[in-house]
Amino acid sequence: LIQVNWDGETVWRFDRTELVEAEGEDPTWMARQHHDWQREGSPAGYYAPGAEPLVDRGRTLILSRREVLRPEITDKLLLDDYIVEVAWDGDVVWEWLPSDHVEEFGFSEAARNAIYRFPGWNETRGSAEWLHINSMSYVGPNRWYEGGDERFHPDNVLWGSRDANVIGITDRSGAIVWRMGPDYRDHPALAELGQIIGQHHPHIIPEGLPGAGYLLVFDNG
């Protein structure tokens, strides 16, 4: 992941997620990022009053990948999403693997059984992408936290799993403290909303914009 200035000069880079060894090549450090990243200061990833991304300091959230073995999920090699937060100097200051928290996803027994047998195996890749998280962001300042709801702490991380149809918030302990899905029959309000399928870019609308504090999400289904 590289940041360049308007003169095309590299002012920041990060590639130290994993040392990858390919046959016939020297080991190479890679970030293994996919889909999303975010710089501190801009929780939604687009312009909002007083919410400009820091360009010469600050933390960066990166959505990456990591292969893991989790026999309680499946007997196949998992390609897990890996959210890592790095300081400006490249030090890893926080990290999260969803597979460590499978019991917090709200999967039914039938869903767990289906995931175990059919976790999204890719023969070419040799691993199973079981969640396909395609977005993550800081929660950012919001009225829910200001009203006393710690689940919506601005530094907590909001993410969306396309394949599991889950939107969640993870706090700094790693716990999933707020969740919508996968079963939208769990609560009358969710049943009225209806099933969200293959969602993209769930985020809290920033302060200073219409609808501030509400969750905005693209329903892909």
Name these PLM-found stretches:
Residues L1-G221:
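Histidine-/acidic-rich catalytic cores in large beta-rich domains
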